[in-house]
Amino acid sequence: MPENYTPAAAATGTWTEEEIRHQPRAWIRSLTNIDALHSALNNFLEPLLRKENLRIILTGAGTSAFIGDIIAPWLASHTGKNFSAVPTTDLVTNPMDYLNPAHPLLLISFGRSGNSPESVAAVELANQFVPECYHLPITCNEAGALYQNAINSDNAFAVLMPAETHDRGFAMTSSITTMMASCLAVFAPETINSQTFRDVADRCQAILTSLGDFSEGVFGYAPWKRIVYLGSGGLQGAARESALKVLELTAGKLAAFYDSPTGFRHGPKSLVDNETLVVVFVSSHPYTRQYDLDLLAELHRDNQAMRVIAIAAESSDIVAAGPHIILPPSRHFIDVEQAFCFLMYAQTFALMQSLHMGNTPDTPSASGTVNRVVQGVIIHPWQA
């Protein structure tokens, strides 16, 4: 670890805060490294991407799985390639449903430690099921099994994140966002690279700076018992990750949910009461934004939630009608870029809510039944 990697300067004295704060710097470091790997990556990927029937699966467990939820929709539309997101936890239990031997496969495995039992098993199962299988692990741990196995394999190319993104805190913060940015830079280098992404890093740094020492919270403090994050398209993945952060860092003391704004009406809205905080991630796409704002206006009219907060790049009459956060000024961001901004608020909220509720964010599970690297998983051998 770098010598200056210490939580001493963090107001809360936690690794989690330090790891939230260093994200913008870590992204640029990682994308600079990927720029330098461009030729080697091309040599590995170009022959694969020319295969018309290539499947590209983004996989991981927990937070690492949500990376795919956030970025796969944009990567698929931007590149025209067959990107999909499937958690390792599904690949391992139901490999026959996801691993088609008739199609070549590129498995992109995300992992902070690279040692999750399901992540290691998913790679082995993919090799077992798919005759023409390739691997691109993106991981934060040089000593982890994902990285070590890949560098010794002929069908793999490993991409290593900066050491400081191997988060020491319980919850994944800088690890998820750096792996996200890095995967985008691998497959869309003309759009996402160390130069273009500085706008995202600068905007996110402005968000973190605006929150000061974090003591005032992000959405204030109130005796809410539930929080719901809502986002459309890939932003539903960001909403899912945001909900998990709260659940993890408060050890379940604050119940957390996620959905899309349109999906929320179909039953899940039943959970909204006067102890519920609802946060809406408003899309930057003019078409999608209409649906987000429709639901936001509906929640204002319902007047059932304790608080409904919109986070958006720009204001509107509907946004301004209730509590809201407008992102610091910048160029127009597509939603996959805006997701990084939304996660800054969500991570910080989870950290401060954890402390506010008497938890220790770096080790929130007092019972020890939930671990930083998952334990207790039995991997059963596949028998055809």
UniProtKB/Swiss-Prot annotation:
Hydrolase among keywords: yes
Its EC number(s): 3.5.99.-
Null allele phenotype: Deletion mutant does not grow on N-acetyl-D-galactosamine.
GO annotations of cellular component type: plasma membrane
Domain SIS as annotated: residue spans: 45-197, 215-364
Keyword Hydrolase (UniProt): yes
Catalytic activity field: D-galactosamine 6-phosphate + H2O = D-tagatopyranose 1-phosphate + NH4(+)
Keywords: Carbohydrate metabolism, Hydrolase, Repeat
Induction statement: Induced by growth on N-acetyl-D-galactosamine.
GO-annotated biological processes: carbohydrate derivative metabolic process; phosphoenolpyruvate-dependent sugar phosphotransferase system
NCBIfam families named among the record's database cross-references: agaS_fam
Similarity field: Belongs to the SIS family. AgaS subfamily.
Name of the protein in its database record: D-galactosamine-6-phosphate deaminase AgaS
Gene coding for it: agaS
